[in-house]
Swiss-Prot record:
Record-annotated membrane-spanning stretches: none
Function: Assembly factor required for Rieske Fe-S protein UQCRFS1 incorporation into the cytochrome b-c1 (CIII) complex. Functions as a chaperone, binding to this subunit within the mitochondrial matrix and stabilizing it prior to its translocation and insertion into the late CIII dimeric intermediate within the mitochondrial inner membrane.
Pfam families: Complex1_LYR (PF05347)
Protein name (Swiss-Prot/TrEMBL): Complex III assembly factor LYRM7
Domain of life according to the entry: Eukaryota
Annotated family: Belongs to the complex I LYR family.
Length: 104
């Protein structure tokens, strides 16, 4: 797949992730839309394959962070906030171990 197709695919993926993550939050949806479009326009004339690859990696990392780390909260009362967890946020719980593993 050539770099142009990869860039377009990432652009679409970021916008789909934005719509999922910020569902029903018009301000956040608009801010994320503007930021995604702004970043892609800023680097529109980039020709270096190495730089394009670096930007694609960064964009992919941003999409993963948005999808797996952002939690949407809704104010229901003056002192209450309801968090809406998506399926992507519900990861396996891996217990933490203080003791270092012994190498054999």
């Amino acid at each position: 797949m050539d770099s142009r197709m990869k860039v377009l695919k990432l652009f679409k993926t970021l916008h789909r992730t934005r719509q999922c993550v910020f569902q029903n939050d018009c301000r956040a949806l608009e801010a994320a839309r503007r930021r995604i479009n702004e970043e892609f326009k800023k680097n529109k004339s980039e020709c270096s394959p190495a730089k394009i690859s670096e930007l694609l990696k960064f964009g992919t990392d941003v999409e993963i962070v948005l999808r797996t780390s952002v939690v949407q909260g809704i104010h229901t009362d003056s002192n209450k906030l309801v968090l809406q967890a998506r399926k992507d946020l519900l990861l396996d719980n891996i217990p933490f171990c203080d003791a270092p593993e012994k190498q054999t």
